[in-house]
UniProtKB/Swiss-Prot annotation:
One of its GO terms (molecular function) is arogenate dehydratase activity. The lineage of its organism: Bacteria, Pseudomonadati, Pseudomonadota, Gammaproteobacteria, Pseudomonadales. CDD domains: PBP2_PheC. Pathway: Amino-acid biosynthesis; L-phenylalanine biosynthesis; L-phenylalanine from L-arogenate: step 1/1; Amino-acid biosynthesis; L-phenylalanine biosynthesis; phenylpyruvate from prephenate: step 1/1. It catalyses: prephenate + H(+) = 3-phenylpyruvate + CO2 + H2O; L-arogenate + H(+) = L-phenylalanine + CO2 + H2O. Forms alternative pathway for phenylalanine biosynthesis. Can catalyze two reactions: prephenate dehydratase and arogenate dehydratase. May have a role in chemotaxis or transport. It is an enzyme of class 4 (lyase). GO terms for biological process: L-phenylalanine biosynthetic process. Coiled coil: none annotated. PANTHER family: AMINO-ACID-BINDING PROTEIN YXEM-RELATED, MEMBRANE-BOUND LYTIC MUREIN TRANSGLYCOSYLASE F. This is Cyclohexadienyl dehydratase. The gene is pheC. Residues 1-25 form the signal peptide. GO terms for cellular component: periplasmic space. The keyword Amino-acid biosynthesis applies.
């Protein structure tokens, strides 16, 4: 065998070995979950009807419900990973979870770092305020006035939307998204701008509060599940969601959690 040809064969063999090692190193997230039998799901526990941490320390809500069903479809054990809106993307970068399910809105900032599943809900920001003040806060122009206090929870799209649209009104940051609506009832803030689905639910839980035109929110947003950049896992989650939607399961479970008897005393 000519020397040059022998060198070529050796080089090709080395490349084949490197390619094989690379493929093994690039084991998909889906394969990892199937092999470990564990699905790590991040959730905030502060966002009814999607995710709520109970007084007993467990979690309830639409996305917690769906997380359990996703784990079962994979033959895996569900492990809930607590996170928060300010820490969500940091926890993602640190690989603390396999998927985040917590009423998460799709936005380009998050999309630059992660994948999203197909959307499961269309939504948008709308005000919630005392029913006696509903006519006063119909537009962003009416809201963005000196003397108006808009309350926000830190680190999520609610704060981002408020800071982008309010230049004259005062923005009050409240650290607890569970008790934040009671602050409006208690007169510590005039309103909050949040997702229409949350505004509707909280107006039911707090009879003093009214969701302002939730059927016509100020902007457009979709909710989806936050995923690592793994094509195989994304395709699996997308197909699982598609089946749940087409079978009516998504609608049925959402109706259940919207009608659920959530604790209401001071937002707890």
């Amino acid at each position: 065998m000519p020397k040059s040809f022998r060198h070529l064969v050796q080089a090709l063999a080395c490349l084949a070995l490197l390619a094989s090692a690379s493929l093994q190193a690039q084991e998909s997230r889906l394969d990892r979950i199937l092999e470990s039998g564990v699905l790590r799901v991040a959730t905030t526990g502060d966002y009814k009807p999607f995710s709520y941490r109970t007084e007993e320390g467990g979690y309830a809500g639409f996305d917690v419900d769906m997380a359990q069903r996703l784990a079962e479809s994979l033959g895996a054990k569900l492990v809930v990973v607590p996170t928060s809106w300010p820490n969500l993307m940091r926890d993602f970068a640190d690989d603390r979870f396999d998927i985040a399910m917590s009423g998460i809105s799709i936005n380009l900032e998050r999309q630059r770092q992660a994948y999203f599943s197909i959307p499961y809900l269309r939504d948008g920001k709308t005000p919630i305020t005392l029913c006696s003040e509903e006519a006063r806060f119909q537009t962003l122009e009416q809201i963005d006035q000196p003397g108006v206090t808009a309350i926000v929870n830190p680190g999520g799209t609610n704060e981002k939307f408020a800071r982008a649209n309010l230049k004259k009104a005062r923005i009050l940051v409240h650290p607890d998204n569970v008790t934040i609506f009671q602050q409006i009832v208690d007169g510590k803030a005039d309103l909050m701008m949040t997702d229409a689905i949350e505004a509707r639910l909280q107006s039911r839980l707090h009879p003093e509060l009214c969701a302002v035109h939730p059927q016509q929110p100020f902007d457009f947003a979709e909710k989806a599940y936050l995923l690592p950049r793994d094509e195989a896992f994304k395709r699996y989650v997308d197909q699982w969601l598609h089946i749940a939607e087409q079978s009516g399961l998504l609608r049925q479970r959402m109706e259940h959690w919207l009608e659920y008897r959530w604790p209401t005393a001071h937002g707890k």
